[in-house]
Amino acid sequence: MKFKERFNEVLKQSGKKQTEIALALNLSKQCVNDYRTGKTLPSIETLYLLCKYLDVSADYLLGLSDY
C-alpha cells in the first residue's frame, strides 16, 4: 500500500478529522488533505508527529511493515 492509502486507513480507524489533525500538529488543512490524496508526502519531522499523534509506526505508514 502507498502512504496515502495507509494514512487514510489510519485516519478512518482513529476517527480523527483532517481539521483536528491540522490543529493539533500546527499544519494547514490543505497540507493534511495533500497527504490524504497523495499530492505530497510529509517531511520526516511531520511524519514523526503524525505517527505519535495517531499512535502508529512510521514503518506502517510508509508501507514497510504491516503492523
Residue ranges and their predicted role:
Residues N26-L41:
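Recognition helix of helix-turn-helix/homeodomain-like DNA-binding domains
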Residues M1-K16:
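A short, Lys/Arg-rich alpha-helix, primarily the initiator
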Residues L11, R36, L54, L62-S65:
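DNA major-groove recognition helix of helix-turn-helix
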Residues R6, K17, S43-T46, S57:
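Residues that mark the N-terminal boundary/hinge immediately upstream of a DNA-recognition element
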Residues F7, I21-A22, V32-Y35, L61:
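Conserved hydrophobic/aromatic packing and binding residues within compact polymer-binding modules
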Residues N26, E45-Y60:
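DNA major-groove recognition helix of helix-turn-helix/homeodomain DNA-binding modules
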Residues K12, L23, K52:
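Alpha-helical residues within the helix-turn-helix
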